[in-house]
Regions:
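N-terminal alpha/beta PP-like core and its mobile active-site loop of ThDP/TPP-dependent enzymes
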Residues: 2-218
Length: 218
């Protein structure tokens, strides 16, 4: 068991444990997560998004979002989230905007690194211009600077994709895994703002996605 009361060691068992106890919010409200735990960044983000009421993920996965996709697979198998596969990022982003706009269901768009993210970003203009809050979560180049990661922006500068998303609207790059709290706070402020909502772009470098984070889940 992990150091928190009753929290299993593996991701699969943790997801089932959350489900058997009524879900993530029920576990937190019952005070069962009072101690520190060490989890991968993508799992922490999924749990944080669930806490914000986001359980629907519209996705086109690739090498830039493999780790995030695997975490979603595990939590979907446990019945805690629902994933929807698409073939076109523009269509996917429009569907997410409509889901929030028409049915008031918060959701997240997930893409890989590069061209797909650019297409989703182009379609985000609809949610931005109409004040519709949607998470846009994109895979991003590693923070190691080891050379081009396939399909990243081909320019010899640091954090190019983060510059693009920052130009488009509210944006955050999780260069440091421990910054997840700030990222989720800023995301919630943008996505759930009562009068100035819009898309929130969260860039996830390939190497930080599996990185361990020590935290209290309550």
């Amino acid at each position: 068991m992990n150091s928190s009361q009753g929290l299993p060691e593996t991701q699969e068992k943790r997801a089932k444990w959350f489900k058997s106890h009524g879900g993530v919010n029920a576990v937190v409200e019952a005070g069962l997560l009072s101690n520190t735990v060490s989890l991968g960044l993508t799992e922490v983000l999924v749990l944080g998004l669930i806490r914000q009421g986001i359980t629907k993920f519209l996705m086109i996965l690739g090498h830039g979002s493999t780790e995030f996709g695997e975490t979603l697979r595990v939590y979907e198998s446990a019945g805690l989230v629902k994933g929807f596969q698409f073939r076109n990022e523009v269509e996917m982003a429009h569907a997410a905007t409509a889901l929030r706009w028409v049915y008031d269901e918060p959701c997240a768009v997930i893409t890989s690194i590069g061209p797909g993210a650019l297409q989703a970003m182009a379609a985000s203009i609809v949610s931005s211009s109409n004040g519709i809050g949607v998470y846009h979560i994109y895979g991003d180049e590693t923070t190691h600077g080891e050379g081009y990661n396939m399909q990243q922006v081909p320019k010899r500068e640091q954090g190019i994709f983060g510059q693009i998303t920052a130009t488009m609207g509210s944006s955050y790059t999780l260069h440091t895994p421990q910054a997840f709290r700030d990222a989720l706070r800023r995301g919630a402020t943008r996505v759930f703002h009562p009068s100035k909502a819009g898309p929130f772009f969260l860039n996830l470098p390939i190497n930080t996605q599996p990185a361990k984070v020590t935290l209290r889940l309550d």
